[in-house]
Amino acid sequence: MPENVVEVVILPIENLNKALATLAKYSHKTLKPAFSEYKVYIPLRESPGRNVVDFIKQELNAEITWMLPDIFPKRKQIISLKKLEKSVGVPIPKSATLVGDILLVNKLPEAAQGREYEIGKVLLKNFGVRAVFLKVEKFNGIQRVASWHKLAGWGDTFTVHRENGCWFSLDISKVFFNPRLSNERLVIAERVERDEFVVDMFAGVGPFAILIKKLSGAQVCAIDINKHAVEFMKLNSKLNKVSISILEGDARLKIAEVGYEASRIIMNYPERSIEFIDSAISVLRSYGFIHVYVFSRVDELESLVHRIEDIVQSHDRKIINLSSRVIEEVSPRRYIYCIDLQVL
């Protein structure tokens, strides 16, 4: 074995599950797999036998090489950002988001100018990630994607995120993904019964749809207008060994193609979800549920609820149960709310 390097298995992301199972007893104890360019890089603590090597090369399309251990995500204790700034003496962002093996920073402090790389290296080491990216252009358009600049680390914006027992492959430069909704996705998934038909109107890479299918076994139809999200959703269905119906296009039009009356509709598009309620109501069965996600200040929520009630009533339907929940604070005094409706 060469000095100061680790043996690494590199293979296509679609073979992730088989690779992890096959290499479990050989996997490194302190280094985690890395993801880049639609491939997984699995560091090993010891070489597998000849039979295993032949299997992963022939059946999983793998290659074996040697790489520096420093480039891999680490299994380690993370220091809070507030404590980190005190200990390292460089300006640290107030918040950062872990997605798979990368760290996302929305904004750097003003004092960070000229020290971006230094800050990136500090964050890279503290969080034990493959790369750190800074948002340089806000989410825009109906596809909700942003532009990112790499502060430190290696590889591209592709990663694989583990959440609620599921794998989600994604590219942050091509799709929208919010890991902070992990608990909310579990809350909704645990409400779904096996005999339901669920429509996810803005499904992204499938975190709601795939988890619901995996936990409940219900029929699920997932819609998204972003072609990249649809491709990732198809891959993620395979990674998680579930089968869901996937439609690409404008949810207002595609929802007419679902083929069944929905028992539950998920509308996770906080910027514009209310605009799509007309379309959702048209396929919702009696006593069905709609989960509408909206951005709102506390003092604006009541008017949003009245607006939703008016839309439902315009279709000669009646809301028989309504409640709202705070999901996440997105800026001072502005939140993502989920408005839960049951409609007769």
Cite the ranges covered by each PLM segment.
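SAM-dependent transferase fold signal centered on methyltransferase-like domains
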Residues: 1-344
